[in-house]
């Protein structure tokens, strides 16, 4: 790609209200584009042909809006990446993904998940929130800004991958070979802004994540097949063995008891603790209302709950399987058992270190026979300093969309993602903006987004690009 000489931008500023007005007029176009994308059942774990077709469509989208767009082939889904170099001094990178969660269970959908439907002021379809809707909104929002000013105030880069929902398995191949593309003056990860009056959160980083499968069985310690439970006092039970092993990982007060774990958890800085203290939402009330809880785990509330969710590591049994699970009864001693365990990591824990500590802990506790396998792609935690100017810029923009008192900046998000794959090869400031997701049914049937959120997102990304260009 030929890079033109850099020039300083001197265009005027378009007020947010004008950006929002233009965005609302563009809603029909946004819905049409989103409908075209929703019709692709682009599930990375299922149908490679549809994934490729969706990637081709995204590439064509970007080319149609004047971007120099390409595909990076991988052993899985292709990565679509695009640049619009206007010769500006600064560059903005936007990360999105075109793959989606499967539609299962289909019978719980009130409309076809692969056909966009608008009803009751909301747009329904798989991927409208995660993440095809935000991608369309960002693409159109930047186009609106370009047409308003005559020229974009920043160079814009889009990275749209196709494996986010399965752990970004091959994204590292792209980031390793395209460090120059990743360089920017600010990057946003799945930017998603709230509707006015609802809360908005800006994360300066994300937790790491590593997923293990633990197995008992398959050795002479256990029977080579399920056994009549009349022999229960004579035959080792793989299910009990695995349950006892898992019980050593945490105590009844929810403390992780893996030897050496706490020593690797970085102390919370004064700046980060101050941000947690200023968190504007009642997290406990929100969680209880959303999930029908009488109380949170251990009754945590206030700052204790906020710190535990956003700044603490976790060990979670995500699934357990053993023995007979069918209707009625079957009296057996199981010969095998397995569990899926999810570890969320904070600095300075890493997936490799977590695996090392877990295996050593099990051996020390007398469970060296438990087989430990790391599954899928693992991510290191990644964090931008909360004092970074780009973080401040994104917060200022978000505060114009929602009430300033409802906009919070948090040192890290509660989730995980491939941010560290970017930071590893081209250090840059990542801001992950997250809206109030209640009612969106993310990863569930009837995924939906308020129609007005499309225009809010368009105006928001235009405002971010405009402010970055003049900063």
Regions found by a protein language model. Give the residues of each.
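Acidic/His- and Gly-rich active-site-bordering loop/insert found
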Residues: 10-126, 147-154, 341
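Short, low-order "capping/linker" segments at domain edges
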Residues: 381-400
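A structural supersecondary motif
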Residues: 299, 303-335, 342
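Zn-dependent metallopeptidase/amidohydrolase metal-coordination segment
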Residues: 22, 215, 222, 242, ...
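Short, conserved charged micro-motifs
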Residues: 348-354
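Short amphipathic alpha-helices in soluble, non-transmembrane regions
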Residues: 354-362
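A short beta-alpha structural unit
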Residues: 39, 343-346, 371-387, 411-414, ...
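Fold-level recognition of mixed alpha/beta catalytic cores in primary-metabolism enzymes, strongest
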Residues: 120-123, 128-300, 306-313, 447-457
């Amino acid at each position: 790609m030929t890079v033109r000489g850099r020039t300083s931008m001197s265009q005027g500023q378009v007020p947010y209200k004008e950006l929002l007005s233009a965005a609302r007029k563009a809603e029909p176009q946004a819905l049409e584009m989103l409908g075209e994308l929703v019709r692709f059942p682009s599930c990375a774990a299922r149908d490679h042909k549809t994934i490729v077709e969706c990637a081709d469509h995204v590439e064509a989208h970007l080319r149609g809006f004047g971007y120099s767009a390409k595909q990076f082939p991988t052993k899985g889904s292709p990565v679509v990446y695009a640049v619009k170099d206007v010769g500006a001094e600064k560059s903005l990178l936007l990360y999105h993904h075109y793959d989606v969660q499967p539609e299962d269970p289909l019978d719980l959908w009130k409309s076809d998940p692969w056909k966009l439907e608008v009803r009751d002021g909301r747009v329904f379809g798989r991927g409208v929130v995660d993440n095809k809707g935000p991608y369309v909104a960002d693409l159109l929002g930047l186009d609106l800004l370009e047409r308003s000013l005559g020229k974009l105030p920043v160079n814009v880069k889009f990275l749209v991958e196709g494996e986010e929902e399965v752990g970004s398995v091959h994204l590292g191949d792209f980031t390793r070979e395209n460090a120059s593309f990743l360089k920017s003056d600010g990057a946003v990860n799945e930017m998603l802004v709230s509707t006015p009056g609802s809360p908005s959160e800006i994360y300066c980083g994300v937790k790491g994540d590593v997923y293990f499968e633990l197995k008992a069985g398959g050795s002479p310690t256990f029977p080579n097949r399920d056994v009549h439970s009349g022999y229960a006092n004579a035959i080792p039970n793989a299910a009990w063995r695995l349950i006892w092993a898992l019980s050593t990982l945490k105590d009844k007060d929810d403390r992780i008891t893996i030897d050496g774990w706490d020593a690797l958890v970085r102390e919370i800085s004064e700046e980060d603790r101050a941000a947690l203290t200023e968190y504007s939402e009642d997290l406990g009330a929100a969680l209880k209302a959303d999930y029908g809880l009488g109380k949170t785990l251990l009754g945590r509330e206030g700052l204790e709950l906020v710190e535990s969710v956003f700044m603490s590591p976790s060990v979670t049994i995500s699934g357990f399987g053993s023995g007979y699970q069918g209707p009625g009864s079957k009296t057996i001693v199981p010969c095998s058992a397995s569990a899926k365990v999810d570890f969320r990591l904070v600095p300075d824990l890493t997936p490799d270190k977590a695996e090392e500590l877990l295996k050593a802990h099990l051996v020390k506790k007398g469970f060296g026979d438990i087989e430990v396998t790391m599954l899928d792609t693992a991510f290191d935690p990644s964090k931008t300093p909360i004092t970074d100017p780009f973080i401040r810029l994104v917060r200022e923009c978000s505060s114009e969309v929602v009430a300033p008192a409802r906009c919070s900046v948090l040192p890290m998000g509660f989730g995980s993602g491939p941010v560290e794959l970017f930071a590893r090869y081209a250090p840059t400031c990542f801001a992950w903006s997250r809206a109030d997701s209640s009612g969106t049914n993310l990863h569930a049937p009837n995924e939906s987004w308020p129609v007005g959120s499309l225009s809010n997102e368009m105006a928001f990304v235009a405002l971010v690009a405009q402010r970055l260009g003049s900063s």
